[in-house]
Amino acid sequence: MTLTLNHCPAPAKLNLFLHVTGRRADGYHLLQSVFQLIDRGDVLHFATRDDNLIQRTTDLPGVPAESDLVVRAAKLLQTVATEKNPAKNFGADIAVEKKLPMGGGLGGGSSDAATTLLALNHLWQTGLSRAELMALGLQLGADVPFFIFGQNAFAEGIGEALVEVETPDRWFVVIEPGVSVPTPQIFSSTELTRDTKPVKISDFSGAQESFGKNDLQVVAEKLFPPIAEAIQWLGQYGDARMTGSGACVFCPFEQEQQADAVLTTVPPHWKAWKAKAIKHHPLAYLQQS
C-alpha cells in the first residue's frame, strides 16, 4: 500500500552571526553561530514504494539524483530500516520543489535532507529518535543535524553541537545577489580569519541585535563583488550581513511593514524577498523524542 506525505516544508536558515574559532586536525573548521529558522524554504512530497527503489521524480538541473542529499538521505535511512526489518521493502518516490537558490548560504540542501529523514522515518515507521536521526544527518553534512534539531540554536564544533536559544520575533529582507558560492572555496582561502575569540551563549542573548559578525563575509565579498554590493546597498537600512558562506545577504526588521517598504526599493537586477523568523521546524510534530 502506498503511503504519502505531501507538502513537507524544508525551511531555510540564516546565520545571525558566524565565527570561525579554529581548525581541527582533519581540516574541518570549528565554528560558533546562531542558526535562525525562517518561514521560506523548499517543499518536498513523499510516496512510499513496495519495490525498495528510491527515486527522485523531479529533474533538478546541475544536481544528479545519485549525488542529491535528498536521495542520499533516503538511502541512508533505508539501510537502517532494512537492518531493523529485513523482511520489508523500503522505497520512496520523492518530488522536490526548489524555492531556495543553490550556493546561497540558506542551508537548502541540508534542510531538504533533514525533511527527507523526518518524513521517511514517519512513513516507513522506522522509529528512530531525534538524536538518532541527527547522527544520521551528520553523515550527510554538518548543517543537517540543526534542521532535525528543529529549534533556533547556538551551534559549536563543526556546527553539530546545538543548544536551543531564544531569538526575537522579526522579519528579514533577503537578497540573492545572483552568484552561487562554492563553500570549499571560502573555507580554503588564505585570507579567512580562523582565530576569532570564542563567545558564550549569554554574550549573544544579552546583545542579540548586531551581535558578532560573519567571518566568511570578507573573503566572499572579495571573490564575489555582487555580494559586497548587496551588503552595501541593504546596509543603508540596518545591520546587513551575509548568511553562511554566501551568497545571500539579509537585514532584520522589527515590523513587517518595514520589510515591505525596503522590498519596494530593491534594484531590479537582484531577486529579493521577505521572511519571518520561526521558532520551530514545521515538521517537529513528526519527531520521536
From Swiss-Prot:
Pathway(s) where this gene product acts: Isoprenoid biosynthesis; isopentenyl diphosphate biosynthesis via DXP pathway; isopentenyl diphosphate from 1-deoxy-D-xylulose 5-phosphate: step 3/6
Instruction: Write down a Pfam family by its short name.
Output: GHMP_kinases_N
Xref: SUPFAM superfamilies: GHMP Kinase, C-terminal domain, Ribosomal protein S5 domain 2-like
Which UniProt key words apply to this protein? ATP-binding, Isoprene biosynthesis, Kinase, Nucleotide-binding, Transferase
Q: Where is the active site?
A: K13, D143
- Disulfide cysteine pairs (residue numbers): none
EC class of the enzyme, as a word: transferase
| Catalytic activity line of the entry | 4-CDP-2-C-methyl-D-erythritol + ATP = 4-CDP-2-C-methyl-D-erythritol 2-phosphate + ADP + H(+)
Question: Which terms in the Gene Ontology molecular function aspect does this entry carry?
Answer: 4-(cytidine 5'-diphospho)-2-C-methyl-D-erythritol kinase activity; ATP binding
Gene Ontology terms describing biological process: isopentenyl diphosphate biosynthetic process, methylerythritol 4-phosphate pathway; terpenoid biosynthetic process
Residue ranges spanning the membrane: these are none
InterPro entries recorded for this chain? Answer: GHMP_kinase_C_dom (IPR013750), GHMP_kinase_C_sf (IPR036554), GHMP_kinase_N_dom (IPR006204), IspE (IPR004424), Ribosomal_Su5_D2-typ_SF (IPR020568), Ribsml_uS5_D2-typ_fold_subgr (IPR014721)
Name the source's superkingdom. Answer: Bacteria
Residues annotated for ATP binding in this entry: P101, M102, G103, G104, G105, L106, G107, G108, G109, S110, S111
Query: Might you give the EC number(s) for this enzyme?
Result: 2.7.1.148
Q: Which PANTHER family match?
A: 4-DIPHOSPHOCYTIDYL-2-C-METHYL-D-ERYTHRITOL KINASE, CHLOROPLASTIC
Purpose of the protein = Catalyzes the phosphorylation of the position 2 hydroxy group of 4-diphosphocytidyl-2C-methyl-D-erythritol.
Q: Which family does it belong to?
A: Belongs to the GHMP kinase family. IspE subfamily.
HAMAP family on file: IspE
Protein name (record): 4-diphosphocytidyl-2-C-methyl-D-erythritol kinase
Q: Which organism is it from?
A: Janthinobacterium sp. (strain Marseille) (Minibacterium massiliensis)
